[in-house]
Amino acid sequence: MQVTVEKKEGIHCSLLIEVPANEIDSVVSKEINRTAKTIKMDGFRPGKVPAGMVKKKYGEQIRMEVISDLIPQKYSKAIQDEKLAVAGIEVELKENKEGQPLKFVANLELFPEFEVTGFEKIEVQKPVVELTDKEVKQMIENLRKQFATFSEVDKVVEKDDKVTIDFVGKKDGEAFEGGTANDIDVIIGSGQMIPGFEDGIIGMKKGEQKTITVTFPQDYQNKDLAEAETTFDITVKKIQQAELPEVNDEFVKKFGVKGGVDTFENEIKENMQRELKFILQRKVKDQVFKGLREIAEFETPKSLIKREIDAAKQNLLKQMGGAKGFDVNQLPDNLFEANAKQKVETSLILDSIMNLQEFKAEEAEVESLLDELVQAYEEPEKTKEQIKKNDKEIANLKALVIENKLTDWVLEQAKVTEKTEDFFEVIKENMQAQQAGF
């Protein structure tokens, strides 16, 4: 086999590979003879079909099957010999004739080689959130609202009321697509509508019609409406007032708590603290990763981005429960491309840093992290034992420990400031970030 490096520029490289004719023809001949012993053909007994007839009828097909098997073997050997770190490969067949050498080009995308420097340029705003009894009481109030019952009343609309409305949205005086609805239930103050919409209904009566003006958010998914000033013609058809359940032993049992109200409040606070800790860690880590992407200079392999896009599509399909009749591959790649590119770049950067720095996940550190994570489950010890039996889960935990250590290492060199934030705003932002990332 002869290998010629045709060109090598950045992360792109082409290998011209030539396989001697006798090697190809020998394998093809053996395959034809093997096929002749098993194939059924009219006029011949099984195993007695002449090799010449098999070659005449199936020779091209057999040759292509042989080549399809042989090409990956040959380019894998060439890549190994040339000591190339390959991210993606495309094969272009050049010459394929009996009695002639097989020639093909392996167009490669290589993993970029780079070193990250300038960690002191990274700026991180570390959120500081105080969790007090006030936030715990508000969380319990939110849980009460989830179990609220509603009854129709004759009064003006107030916060927390459920209203049934019709509305027509207009932009520049013309109704826009998706802006009209009938018999829609809205809980005032829930934030299910765009900012300003629910506030505009407060004070209205049953049967009243009113036109309000609202501006769509800058990050609204429909770009034609983002930041647009619009009007909504609203008709209130029904007003229902919420009745919240009393916080007692019966109420807390709905959440699987057996120790009464005091135990319930303690568990709520512990859950809030645990959730807050992981969210704040994630916020800091996201800023660190963003900073790393800004200071690192390298070309990102498109094949890795494509692979990540495909994985994101399959993950979305899994979240949808398999969705029969829905072809996730019909979704455009650009819907996933930005997140995919970020994930690939972050992974490459972390690998680059870890090649120079030794970060290890000690067994005790993995155990400690696991203990924290399982507390969110109903049966922590049982869940812990199940996870410990799963090698993939343990590998993920080790990777997370190392990722946390790397993040702390970068933070020691970065510019870190603190910013006080509200607990519920942090939770809301986290939910929005998760939704944006599918």
From Swiss-Prot:
<dbReference type="InterPro" id="IPR036611">
    <property type="entry name" value="Trigger_fac_ribosome-bd_sf"/>
</dbReference>
<dbReference type="GO" id="GO:0044183">
    <property type="term" value="F:protein folding chaperone"/>
</dbReference>
<dbReference type="InterPro" id="IPR001179">
    <property type="entry name" value="PPIase_FKBP_dom"/>
</dbReference>
<dbReference type="Pfam" id="PF05698">
    <property type="entry name" value="Trigger_C"/>
</dbReference>
<dbReference type="GO" id="GO:0043022">
    <property type="term" value="F:ribosome binding"/>
</dbReference>
<keyword id="KW-0963">Cytoplasm</keyword>
<dbReference type="InterPro" id="IPR008880">
    <property type="entry name" value="Trigger_fac_C"/>
</dbReference>
<dbReference type="InterPro" id="IPR005215">
    <property type="entry name" value="Trig_fac"/>
</dbReference>
<keyword id="KW-0132">Cell division</keyword>
<dbReference type="GO" id="GO:0051083">
    <property type="term" value="P:'de novo' cotranslational protein folding"/>
</dbReference>
<comment type="function">
    <text>Involved in protein export. Acts as a chaperone by maintaining the newly synthesized protein in an open conformation. Functions as a peptidyl-prolyl cis-trans isomerase.</text>
</comment>
<dbReference type="GO" id="GO:0003755">
    <property type="term" value="F:peptidyl-prolyl cis-trans isomerase activity"/>
</dbReference>
<dbReference type="InterPro" id="IPR027304">
    <property type="entry name" value="Trigger_fact/SurA_dom_sf"/>
</dbReference>
<protein>
    <recommendedName>
        <fullName>Trigger factor</fullName>
        <ecNumber>5.2.1.8</ecNumber>
    </recommendedName>
</protein>
<keyword id="KW-0143">Chaperone</keyword>
<dbReference type="InterPro" id="IPR046357">
    <property type="entry name" value="PPIase_dom_sf"/>
</dbReference>
<dbReference type="GO" id="GO:0043335">
    <property type="term" value="P:protein unfolding"/>
</dbReference>
<dbReference type="GO" id="GO:0061077">
    <property type="term" value="P:chaperone-mediated protein folding"/>
</dbReference>
<dbReference type="GO" id="GO:0005737">
    <property type="term" value="C:cytoplasm"/>
</dbReference>
<keyword id="KW-0413">Isomerase</keyword>
<keyword id="KW-0697">Rotamase</keyword>
<feature type="domain" description="PPIase FKBP-type">
    <location>
        <begin position="160"/>
        <end position="245"/>
    </location>
</feature>
<dbReference type="GO" id="GO:0051301">
    <property type="term" value="P:cell division"/>
</dbReference>
<keyword id="KW-0131">Cell cycle</keyword>
<dbReference type="Pfam" id="PF05697">
    <property type="entry name" value="Trigger_N"/>
</dbReference>
<dbReference type="GO" id="GO:0015031">
    <property type="term" value="P:protein transport"/>
</dbReference>
<dbReference type="InterPro" id="IPR037041">
    <property type="entry name" value="Trigger_fac_C_sf"/>
</dbReference>
<comment type="similarity">
    <text>Belongs to the FKBP-type PPIase family. Tig subfamily.</text>
</comment>
<dbReference type="Pfam" id="PF00254">
    <property type="entry name" value="FKBP_C"/>
</dbReference>
<dbReference type="InterPro" id="IPR008881">
    <property type="entry name" value="Trigger_fac_ribosome-bd_bac"/>
</dbReference>
